[in-house]
């Protein structure tokens, strides 16, 4: 006999794990399915964020890799630093975060299926038949569910049976090295979130150094607005940039590579994704929750999960299908911010020269305090920064009148 669930969640990332956590907490019978055999596999998120999500999602200390105090933006020429005596944010341990969310789901009465990849869905009048394949044995297993959640990230594997059915996508790609360095080098960066802009350190994107537990650093590079046919070339470029940051910025050849991981983001401009169709609800990167400017995804993936759970819970309790409101509410809250970030992303990563990036960062460093910068980078609260932008254009005009480029 086929085992039945109220909800099957496909994908054990932050969005999928949070969905399972919330629905099991509400008393629903949930299966969380993850294609990898361990949450330490495919550990592809840099996971830097502010402190607020720890409280927002009630996350424990054990998922924190490191607290950070300072923000450094290194351009091709100069570095611009904002400092604090207190912690401003965290770098999460992505594997431990996913494990925690799954464990909480189990504690709430849910089930977790590891090492099984999604194969197909078959829509029925009273639910959905879902097929999974064991990654080791290739054996098929089938379940039935009232609702199916697509938390497969940018591949959107559950919502769309055919890639041609997906909306237009913008692609981004990144790679990250998890390295063990000397105590001396680690101590230089243990409190800093470092971003790199400009062609010396990045190409159509940005690079980064994030601290983790003692002597461990995350070093990576990402590129946006790429073509699918250029994926292999992009992977080689981001790999070279990452190794350049290690060699020329950290100035070390004496390090141990603990892990190398990467991934491809597929983002729908103006959030044109399908949020619900035929008993399938999409969450997280499957509805473009990753921010197009900074690439931050965890917080917004989990927020989308919380919002989706409100409508899933209502459907399971009353039978009412209000999922159009799920899409409408999410876009109402985030669309304008995301569109501003889309425009900013193209300007910063593609249009601006090194000199233009340098001039703008120097101006912001001189005029914006730490909280203003964090509000723009992590919360996309642009009001004060927009005032700075008007000031930028005044400065730009003065540069033009003097025959210089700003």
Residue ranges and their predicted role:
Residues 12, 107-252:
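Predominantly flavin-linked oxidoreductase catalytic cores and closely associated redox partners
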Residues 2-13:
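Beta1/beta-strand and adjacent pyrophosphate-binding region of the FAD-binding site
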Residues 36-59:
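Conserved N-terminal glycine-rich FAD pyrophosphate-binding loop of Rossmann-like flavoproteins
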Residues 120, 225-311, 316, 324:
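FAD/FMN-dependent oxidoreductases across multiple families
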Residues 52-100:
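A conserved beta-strand/loop capping segment in the N-terminal third of enzymes
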Residues 310-406:
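C-terminal helical "tail/cap" subdomain of flavin- and related membrane-associated enzymes
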Residues 8, 24-43:
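Glycine-rich FAD pyrophosphate-binding loop
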Residues 16-17:
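N-terminal Rossmann-fold NAD(P) dinucleotide-binding loop
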């Amino acid at each position: 006999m086929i085992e039945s669930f109220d909800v099957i969640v496909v994908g054990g990332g932050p969005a999928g794990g949070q969905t399972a956590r919330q629905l099991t907490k509400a008393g629903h019978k949930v299966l969380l399915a993850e294609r990898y055999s361990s949450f330490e596999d495919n550990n592809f998120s840099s996971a830097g964020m502010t402190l607020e999500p720890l409280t927002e999602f009630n996350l424990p200390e054990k998922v924190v890799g490191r607290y950070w105090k300072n923000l450094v933006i290194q351009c091709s020429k100069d570095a611009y630093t904002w400092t604090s005596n207190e912690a401003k944010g965290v770098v999460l341990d992505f594997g431990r975060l996913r494990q925690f969310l799954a464990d909480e789901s189990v504690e709430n009465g849910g089930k977790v299926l590891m090492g099984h990849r999604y194969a197909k869905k078959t829509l029925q009048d009273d639910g959905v038949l879902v097929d999974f394949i064991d990654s080791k044995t290739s054996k098929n297993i089938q379940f039935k569910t009232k609702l199916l959640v697509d938390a497969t990230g940018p591949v959107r594997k559950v919502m769309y049976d055919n890639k041609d059915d997906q909306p237009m996508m913008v692609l981004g790609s990144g790679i990250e090295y998890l390295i063990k360095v000397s105590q001396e080098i680690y101590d230089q960066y243990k409190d800093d979130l470092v971003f790199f802009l400009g062609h010396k350190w990045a190409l159509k994107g940005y690079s980064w150094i994030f601290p983790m537990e003692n002597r461990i650093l995350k070093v990576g590079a990402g590129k946006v607005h790429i073509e699918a046919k250029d994926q292999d070339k992009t992977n080689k470029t981001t790999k070279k940039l990452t190794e350049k940051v290690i060699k020329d910025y950290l100035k070390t050849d004496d390090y141990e590579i603990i892990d190398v991981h990467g991934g491809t983001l597929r983002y729908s401009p103006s959030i044109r994704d399908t949020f619900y169709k035929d008993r399938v609800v999409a969450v997280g990167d499957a509805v473009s929750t990753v921010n197009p400017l900074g690439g931050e995804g965890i917080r917004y993936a989990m927020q989308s999960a919380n919002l989706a759970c409100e409508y899933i819970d209502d459907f399971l309790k009353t039978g009412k299908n209000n999922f159009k409101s799920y899409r409408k509410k999410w876009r109402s809250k985030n669309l304008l911010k995301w569109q501003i970030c889309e425009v900013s992303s193209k300007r910063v990563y593609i249009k601006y020269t090194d000199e233009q990036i340098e001039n703008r960062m120097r101006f912001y460093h001189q005029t914006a305090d730490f909280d203003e910068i964090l509000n723009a980078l992590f919360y996309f609260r642009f009001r004060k920064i927009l005032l700075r932008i008007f000031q930028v254009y005044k400065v730009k005009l003065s540069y033009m009148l003097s025959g210089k480029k700003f």
